[in-house]
Regions:
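Long amphipathic alpha-helical segments used for membrane anchoring, targeting, substrate engagement
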Residues: 1-70
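Catalytic zinc-binding patch centered on the HExxH motif and its immediate surroundings
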Residues: 53-57, 113-139
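Short helix/loop segments within enzyme catalytic domains
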Residues: 76-78, 82-102, 107, 193, ...
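Extracytoplasmic
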Residues: 83, 102-104, 123-125, 131-135, ...
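Active-site recognition of the HExxH zinc-binding catalytic motif
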Residues: 95, 138, 156, 160-173, ...
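Short pre-active-site segment immediately N-terminal to the catalytic Zn-binding motif
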Residues: 142-160, 190-196
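Catalytic Zn2+-binding segment of zinc metalloproteases
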Residues: 166-181, 213-214
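Pan-zinc metallopeptidase signature
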Residues: 233-282
Length: 282
């Protein structure tokens, strides 16, 4: 993806130089994540976006202090940090044009562990969005995990990750998150299928943003994003972790579903085409 550093929107909080109080003890967040809780995959806690936080004595929802930015000339992740901010700002500008009620989220960069409005989390959960504080949480080390562990390298694969989380913010502003949580409470048996539809819509919204920056893309960029969406499919992650696949436990969608809905948004650029809740078969 072709990009250049420009004026920051001021929506990035860089706390990579801070430490979370309490030594970084971890609870599963009640936020909405790209891949769910990777470290707990074997016990089927794939649902960073399931809406059900795991009780914990440390899950008090307190906020970690801001600040802790690393000086640019001492930052080995500077290029990735600046690219992440660029993509985040680009996605938000796109949604401001598309969605009249859009209000900016914040991008919160951290290392290792973080305390959020949705509870405490470690970088093992992957990138996630917290509706309670309207922040996207990102540990830049996940970029290396995508390449080395998930087989999804490339700058536009990373851009897809960020755009997916911004998509969750759009859902929050539109009331989609609240609607899904209400339906999950009313019919717990549908909690996972509803979560899948929510995540696939965020994938489609990421595609809508990709459509808006088509003139900045290099050959192979869209393919990178599609590979990334496939790499974080529930079926592929479950097979890697346990050697078996249980579709009834999916919370984010299969590799094929995630790639399909990203392509849908990327092809049309129309958010209206991302209504994953009105179709019988996602």
């Amino acid at each position: 993806m072709r990009w250049k550093r420009g004026q920051s929107s001021g929506n990035t909080i860089d706390a990579r130089g801070s430490r979370m109080p309490g030594g970084g003890r971890v609870a599963v967040p009640g936020g909405l994540g790209l891949v769910g809780v990777l470290v707990f995959l074997a016990v089927q806690l794939l649902g960073g976006g399931s809406g059900y936080a795991v009780p914990s004595a440390f899950d008090d929802g307190t906020q970690a202090p801001g600040g802790g930015a690393i000086p640019a000339d001492q930052d080995p992740e500077r290029d990735l940090r600046d690219f992440s901010e660029y993509v985040f700002d680009s996605a938000q500008r796109s949604w401001t044009r598309t969605f009249g009620g859009y209000r900016d989220a914040k991008l919160y960069l951290y290392r290792g562990a973080v305390s959020t409005g949705c509870g405490n989390a470690s970088s093992a959960v992957g990138p996630f969005y917290c509706p309670a504080d309207q922040r996207v949480y990102l540990d830049l080390s996940f970029f290396g995990d995508m390449e080395q562990q998930l087989g999804a390298p490339g700058d536009f694969a990373w851009a897809y990750v960020i755009a997916h989380e911004v998509g969750h913010h759009v859902q929050n502003l539109r009331g989609t998150n609240d609607d899904v949580r209400r339906l999950q409470r009313e019919d717990p048996g549908q909690a996972n299928p509803l979560s899948v539809r929510l995540e696939l819509q965020a994938d489609c919204y990421a595609g809508v943003w990709a459509h808006s920056v088509f003139d900045q893309l290099d050959d192979g960029d869209v393919a990178e994003a599609i590979r990334a969406s496939e790499a974080v499919g529930d079926d592929r992650l479950q097979r890697r972790a346990t050697g078996e696949v249980r579709p009834d436990s999916f919370t984010h969608g299969s590799s094929a579903q995630r790639a399909k809905w990203f392509r849908t948004g990327q092809a049309s650029g129309e958010p209206a085409d991302c209504d994953t809740f009105s179709v019988d078969d996602v």
